[in-house]
């Protein structure tokens, strides 16, 4: 499992009071997407951040909306999406574009983007990572924890 060695998430240890975090979540593969979103919201609620959720059609739309949220004042974004490999190059195009775009949004704004974009070979891999009752991992929660932790680190570095 890809999560081997991942740190334990203790959302109660995060104090994100005063932070504004936008969750940008794709709509494809609803059961997996809903699990990712629930995990992210659980961590953000426990951290005490002000949260806005924006649903986008798919993963390709994540970067432009993430960038807009950061430009509009969000301290961080949690990007959630699901891309499952099929029989055409579409998987590679969308995965690469979304990943590159999210990286650019973060670097150009100087604000964190928690990366909760699952790129999968099959649906079961997504179910295993979606934070559902039978899941082994919770990538939505991990992405939210990364976004809040990094936003707090950047505030400390910048003396804000």
Swiss-Prot record:
GO biological process, one term: riboflavin biosynthetic process
Keyword hit for Lyase: no
Reaction catalyzed: (2S)-2-hydroxy-3-oxobutyl phosphate + 5-amino-6-(D-ribitylamino)uracil = 6,7-dimethyl-8-(1-D-ribityl)lumazine + phosphate + 2 H2O + H(+)
Domain of life: Bacteria
Binding locations of (2S)-2-hydroxy-3-oxobutyl phosphate: 87-88, 129
GO cellular component assignments: cytosol; riboflavin synthase complex
GO molecular-function terms, A-Z: 6,7-dimethyl-8-ribityllumazine synthase activity
Pathway as given in its UniProt record: Cofactor biosynthesis; riboflavin biosynthesis; riboflavin from 2-hydroxy-3-oxobutyl phosphate and 5-amino-6-(D-ribitylamino)uracil: step 1/2
UniProt EC number: 2.5.1.78
Keywords: Riboflavin biosynthesis, Transferase
Catalytic residue list: 90 (proton donor)
Gene3D superfamilies membership: Lumazine/riboflavin synthase
Annotated InterPro entries: LS, LS/RS, LS/RS_sf
Binding site for 5-amino-6-(D-ribitylamino)uracil: 28, 59-61, 82-84, 115
Similarity comment text for this entry: Belongs to the DMRL synthase family.
Functional note: Catalyzes the formation of 6,7-dimethyl-8-ribityllumazine by condensation of 5-amino-6-(D-ribitylamino)uracil with 3,4-dihydroxy-2-butanone 4-phosphate. This is the penultimate step in the biosynthesis of riboflavin.
Name the UniProt record assigns to this protein: 6,7-dimethyl-8-ribityllumazine synthase
Species: Clavibacter sepedonicus
Gene behind this protein: ribH
């Amino acid at each position: 499992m890809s999560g081997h060695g991942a740190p334990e998430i203790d959302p109660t240890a995060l104090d994100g009071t005063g932070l504004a975090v936008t969750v940008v979540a794709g709509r494809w593969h609803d059961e997996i997407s809903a699990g990712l979103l629930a995990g992210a919201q659980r961590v953000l609620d426990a951290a005490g951040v002000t949260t806005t959720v924006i649903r986008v059609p798919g993963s390709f739309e994540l970067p432009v909306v993430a960038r807009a949220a950061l430009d509009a004042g969000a301290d961080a974004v949690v990007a959630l999406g699901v891309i499952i490999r099929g029989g055409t190059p579409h998987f590679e195009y969308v995965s690469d574009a979304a990943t590159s775009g999210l990286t650019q949004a973060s670097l150009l704004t100087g604000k964190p983007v928690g990366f909760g974009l699952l790129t999968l070979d099959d649906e079961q891999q997504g179910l295993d990572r979606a934070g559902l009752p039978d899941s082994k991992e919770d990538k939505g929660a991990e992405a939210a924890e990364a976004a809040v932790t990094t936003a707090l680190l950047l505030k400390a570095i910048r003396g804000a």
